């Protein structure tokens, strides 16, 4: 496919790039170590042969990523499904979701789209802050990721946002791909999910016509992701205390790596994805001459409401809400056994936090908030 050169530094690798990228990956010692860890019984030559047989990115995903994610879910989840009954699986969409897990939010979506009869997976927006290792950057671009550049000057950021938006419009219109992007930069560590207007502003920099036209051209779909348990909850709580105790605290070079590993392999309980109807009709209902900031405010609020309404809540969400509010207002939603099980889970997660000045009460409150906030937002949206 003839892809404009301006996208070369951010786009996923194309089929014609793959042979060279595979050769590069197979020469990398760290990549080989990862393969040996994931496939201890399989000879390296056999994996290399299977990799080189992949002619497209989708071939790679079906040969490697699909089975890997299903294997993870089999071991670390009690069930996983997607409600996408409001969508047409012959069309392509931009899924914009709440963000819980660095790797799995988009990886599970890819698997669920295939399982629900979509003809392809998603191109994935990923921040370059996660891609400091060149082989990781190669691998995610094979896996259909496009790159969001971070830590730029204001002028560079404007140029980068415009290129990113142009690329997203190109991927939807010319490549007929789906896209996944988080509703905000980074995960909502407290699970209080809110769409950042800056994401909508970026998306409307590309395309043609009015702001409403440009957003419509991306066929936006609000997507709710609900994990019964977040394996990274204790890491997120630890980070809250580190930031509270030291205003200058910054993540270390391995922190994201630990979060990725914990998120992938940790226990998730039940996992549910729910796609709201595409926003095209909603966008058509807006006054076309509305001030642009009003458009962004309205669309962001509407997306939030759709995401909140479509959460799958679990007993733990209601237990957390009642514990935080010192109430029994939601006890109809859980049993005494559910409550005891959830409280035991929280104690186990708190025990994993290693801090010299560990503030147990604060850390517990932070973890409870992560489970209570989806319930608060769901109840407010009904």
Predicted regions located by residue number:
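Long, low-complexity C-terminal extensions of enzymes
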Residues: 295, 307-382
């Amino acid at each position: 496919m003839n892809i404009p050169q301006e996208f070369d530094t951010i786009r996923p690798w194309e089929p014609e790039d793959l042979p060279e990228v595979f050769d590069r990956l197979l020469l990398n010692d760290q990549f080989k170590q990862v393969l040996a860890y994931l496939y201890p019984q399989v000879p390296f030559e056999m994996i290399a042969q299977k990799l080189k047989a992949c002619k497209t990115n989708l071939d790679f995903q079906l040969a490697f990523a699909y089975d890997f994610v299903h294997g993870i879910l089999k071991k670390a989840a009690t069930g996983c499904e997607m409600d996408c009954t409001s969508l047409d699986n012959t069309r392509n969409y931009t899924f914009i979701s709440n963000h819980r897990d660095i790797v799995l939010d988009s990886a599970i979506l890819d698997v669920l789209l295939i399982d629900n009869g979509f003809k392809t997976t998603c191109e994935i927006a990923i921040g370059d802050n996660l891609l400091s290792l060149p082989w990781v950057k190669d691998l995610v671009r094979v896996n259909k990721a496009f790159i969001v550049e971070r830590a730029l000057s204001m002028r560079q950021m404007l140029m980068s946002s415009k290129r990113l938006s142009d690329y997203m419009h190109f991927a939807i219109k010319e490549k007929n791909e789906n896209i996944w992007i988080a509703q905000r930069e980074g995960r909502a560590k407290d699970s209080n999910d809110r769409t950042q207007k800056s994401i909508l502003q970026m998306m409307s920099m590309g395309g043609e016509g009015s702001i409403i036209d440009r957003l419509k051209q991306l066929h936006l779909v609000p997507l709710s992701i609900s994990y019964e348990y977040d394996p990274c909850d204790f890491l997120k709580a630890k980070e809250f205390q580190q930031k509270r105790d030291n205003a200058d605290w910054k993540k270390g070079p391995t922190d994201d790596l630990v979060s990725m590993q914990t998120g992938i392999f940790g226990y998730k309980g039940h996992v549910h994805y729910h796609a709201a109807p595409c926003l095209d009709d909603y966008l058509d209902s807006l006054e076309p001459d509305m001030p642009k900031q009003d458009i962004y405010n309205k669309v962001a609020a509407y997306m939030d409401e759709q995401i909140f309404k479509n959460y799958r809540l679990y007993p733990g969400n209601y237990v957390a809400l009642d514990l935080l509010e010192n109430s029994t207002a939601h006890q109809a939603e859980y049993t005494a056994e559910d409550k005891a099980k959830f409280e035991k889970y929280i104690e186990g997660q708190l025990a994993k936090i290693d801090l010299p000045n560990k503030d147990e009460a604060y850390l517990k409150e932070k973890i409870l908030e992560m489970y209570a906030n989806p319930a608060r937002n769901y109840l407010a949206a009904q």
